[in-house]
Amino acid sequence: MIFNKLEEVEDRFREVEGLLSDPQVVSQQKRFLELTREHAELSSVVAVYREYKRVSEDIEGNRELLQDSDPEMREMAKAELPELEAHREELAQQLKVLLLPKDPNDDKNVILEIRAGTGGDEAALFAGDLFRMYSRFAEGQGWKVETMSVSDSEAGGFKEIIAMISGNRVYSQLKYESGTHRVQRVPETEAQGRIHTSACTVAVLPEAEDVDVDIDPTDLRIDVYRASGAGGQHVNKTESAVRITHVPTGVVVSCQDEKSQHKNKAKAMKVLKSRILDQVMADQQAQMAADRKSQVGSGDRSQRIRTYNFPQGRCTDHRIGLTLYRLEGIMQGNLSELVEPLTLHYQSEAMAAQEA
């Protein structure tokens, strides 16, 4: 079954290669770009499949040599076979992953929302730590981070911070970060040295494009008001802050970071569209979960997904039972140590669901 699919992919790859060299196609910019993207997606599958076929031919050749009259040739073939068979098995696993249904949001930018939860000032400080962690990870990936909305805490950190992270395949790397993040550490103000537990919630929403969400302007209520600082005092004499309410869903977004009302409105609309898209996706996922047990990347935000224990230098991801004693590096943005095992875990779940 899988090999029939792979043959179809290779046939389509050859067809697309031919089309990309057709002058008529080259002259149609939109069509040419679509085919270029498809060619890039197919090429990764085809490269592994062709390597799989080459290794399979080598295995067959070595098996034939086992019957050779020359004892040295037989011994050489026998010695090479285990390594070739192991390599072929690795390639087969890669192909299974490559043929999994693609998440249509993987290539998208994200809206990152971090909110302080239980724990008061400590939770707000941890929200700041999490934002720095994600910002440094983004910097390492060559992504751009743009703050959309900030609610500062007087003790430092954030009550809430919303940012846009844009770049190559951002959602694919950050989609498993949605959930409740718990921190255990001794606050600087704690004289007795007792460990306090605080929590923040993280939401990672794929950036909504106009084609994803159709919002009727008559469904929006837009309020303008004067921006205020951390202590509640007004910091702007003009009504530049914007609050947008989507009446049918009750989704409310406020933005006051920019001095221009127009810019605040544009930022608020981006967040609003992404939140509504997230609601639509959540409804769809709930429907899918009723049909199949495994729900990949559902990002259930009521779930405690990770604990950061500072006294022990430990970070534990509860979804996959992974514990790393490299907390300092993780907080500095070395998130790949968590992202890669999570991705592999959910890919394995998806493969098991396909084979069931």
Curated annotation (Swiss-Prot):
The molecular function terms of the Gene Ontology recorded here are:
translation release factor activity, codon specific
Keyword Cytoplasm assigned:
yes
Write out the PTM section of this UniProt entry.
Methylated by PrmC. Methylation increases the termination efficiency of RF1.
Which Pfam families does the entry link to?
PCRF, RF-1
Compartment annotation: Cytoplasm
Which PANTHER family does this UniProt record tie to the protein? LD18447P
- Name this polypeptide is given: Peptide chain release factor 1
Whose protein is this, by species?
Syntrophotalea carbinolica (strain DSM 2380 / NBRC 103641 / GraBd1)
Q: From which lineage does this chain's organism come?
A: Bacteria, Pseudomonadati, Thermodesulfobacteriota, Desulfuromonadia, Desulfuromonadales
